[in-house]
Amino acid sequence: GLIEKYLRSGKIKINKKKIKSSIKVKTNDIINFFNFDFKETIVQKKIKFEPSKEIIKSNEDQIIDNNENFIVLNKSSGISVQGGTKSKKNLVDIFAKSEIFQGTKPYSVHRLDKDTSGVFIMAKTRESAQLLTSLFRLRKVHKTYLAICHGELNKDSGEWNDDLIRYDGEKKIIEKAKTLYKVLDKNSEASLIELKPITGRKHQLRKQLYAVGQPIFGDVKYKLSNSFKGINKNLMLHSYQIRFIANNIKHTYTALLPDYFKKLLKTKRLRFLD
């Protein structure tokens, strides 16, 4: 522990002598503290993920396009884009070991929640990463999501303009969030909704659907008390299509719906005409 560490480094001494933690303190012993910080600092280390050949292959099989500048894949639900202190399995570490990125490394150029499936782009070079990142930041990338949510929306189409709250430590931050929506099919139990986020706030679509009382199926974070009945473990939010222009070339990428998404559409008697 921390005391053990300070004993080894000599920040804690007995009678001005370095001692081991096994030594017992006697009466009249003097405990010395040198450059001692009584505040324990917790350092969170990023977890390194070592993917198996099977995991690498299964993710390579999800690739929609592979060109000299970037790859596009249909990301599975339950896998993070980048590693972190909480997440282990992630796309950056997986593709770093792939032959596709031999001689280079994968660059993550945009966000996609761990539990959200669908279109995701990874750059192959620093130059491509800078270009694509700037396109996302300048809102030049047009994104379309599909979601299955509880109940019916009052209007079949429209836009949401919300002030979303997030916290940076104890600091409260309010961010403007704008999304265009269109109901593709609905009944009293569920709705299939097309979502086009104009801004890119964290958990934007999930928060906005929760705010109108129609949370997404499978969302355990933004849910009404009676809305989550364990029908499906997966979050029913899918990044369906991405469109952008890069170097005067138009790019459009569409990701097929996961089987569990199609299964819930059928269960809820919702139709999707792709």
Model regions: which residues?
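RNA pseudouridine synthases
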Residues: 1-274
